[in-house]
Amino acid sequence: MSKPTLAVIGSGIAGLSAAWLLRNQYQVTLFERHARPGMGAYAVSAGTNQRTGKAVTIDIPLRVITSGYYNELFNLYKTLGVEIERTDHSGAFFTHTGGDIFHYKTYTIGERRFAFLNSPKRLSKHNISQGMAAIKFFAEIKKVDLSNVGNLTFGEFLQQWPHSKANFIDNVLMPMLSTICTCDYDSVKQYPASIIIGYLACGVAKDGVWKATHGVADIVQRITQGYQVEANCDIQNIKIDDTENSPIQVIFNRHQQTEKQSFDHIVIATQPQHAAPLIEAAAPEIVQHFKHIKYAKSSMVVHRDDSIYPRPWQDLSPVCYSINPSLQRPMATVCLNKSMPTVKDCLPIFQTWHPTTTIAADKTLADVTFERPVINFDTLKHIESIKQSMLKANNRVWFCGSYLGEGIPLLEAGVQSALFVANQLGAYKPW
Ligand SMILES: Cc1cc2nc3c(=O)[nH]c(=O)nc-3n(C[C@H](O)[C@H](O)[C@H](O)COP(=O)(O)OP(=O)(O)OC[C@H]3O[C@@H](n4cnc5c(N)ncnc54)[C@H](O)[C@@H]3O)c2cc1C
């Protein structure tokens, strides 16, 4: 008997995971508007590694992960055979005028890794006091009983928590969180406290940061086996007839031609702001929920312009934050040569989030603007309604994306949301 057909719209981590998890039970077609699957759509070539002579590709964004927080993603990578490697994301914090705030570095002794103050050159009374505040903060945040912070925003929680040292919160913690959540400080403070604490308490500071050794291209190659991928297909509309078992029509533009295909089920794995226009006519009541989910824009530049760093930059920790108190976000630059083993022997190359100074155009390799949902208590109500809509009997329209998982919309949440949909459609976790 032939399998039922299923369309997945969008090939970020959520769509790729859903398509892969459902490939045995359904005849799956994955549609992506970019020329390459979305997770790897913005990768850029960065020349060759001068030691190995191998070509180097840089993913945009890098997509780093931590073992304590990314349970399902680690399981997925293991099942797919994706190798992972450690990266160094320790930080150097400066004011926008170049004044020292805080420097820490990751040290390795045998198998153990730990964060501590950077080189003696950077030791100062101020740096030591920030270091002590950080140690205290991360030790105490693990002890917070999440059931006691249920109604608090993260901002409210910080205001009443005795371990919140204003200097550390404003100059170190908020710049880091604003970079991780890619939104402004006010939006970070509007996150439910339990979500941010859940992230901070998961050993982020202790176990360090990892990434896929061979980058997103390797993940995509493994996770696109066993089903059909249709790139360059910009979905315009989805037509759903309420009559039971009537096919769902997917209408899309490919190379300036309009095409149409029919499916038994559909998984919309785009971000919420892109899902709404697709189902405006077919499911207006759900569109209202999508329209309430806010998103933030952020830009990322990959470049070779070292003037972005305070001098001398060579001994700084890999991630350099520039903090201007009159702005709502820091500028954060990763020196990829220091952070990633595969890029160590390449010409200097940097990835800057939210540039606030000019990066030389002739040293720029890529400049990409991203959108990403931000979570607050109002958003959570609408997300819950979207989840409930999928539990209706005989439902055939499914949604997944990192905004529908638990916690911060990161890769882990994307995989969680795909597992939820796969489970509803009769496919179980292969791990
Ligand atoms: C700057 C930045 C840095 C980040 N760094 C990290 C990190 O280090 N670690 C981490 O865990 N997370 C990180 N994230 C978050 C992570 O990238 C997201 O959580 C994740 O990409 C969301 O996956 P998704 O599948 O839900 O959505 P997306 O990745 O947005 O995928 C949706 C896909 O749908 C496609 N699409 C949309 N509309 C249509 C249409 N009409 N037709 C066809 N296709 C369509 C899009 O092109 C896209 O490919 C970062 C995010 C940003 C913005």
Q: For the regions a protein language model found, what residue spans apply to each?
A:
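Helical element adjacent to the flavin cofactor pocket in flavoenzyme catalytic cores
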Residues: 196-257
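Mid-domain catalytic core of redox enzymes
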Residues: 236-375
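Conserved flavin/dinucleotide-binding core of flavoenzymes
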Residues: 329-431
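Glycine-rich FAD pyrophosphate-binding loop
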Residues: 23-48
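N-terminal Rossmann-like FAD-binding beta1-loop-alpha1 element of flavoenzymes
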Residues: 4-30
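Mobile amphipathic helical/loop "lid" adjacent to a hydrophobic cofactor/ligand pocket
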Residues: 67-189
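N-terminal glycine-rich dinucleotide-binding loop that anchors FAD/FMN and/or NAD(P) in oxidoreductases
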Residues: 44-73
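Conserved Rossmann-like nucleotide-cofactor binding loop
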Residues: 14, 36, 273
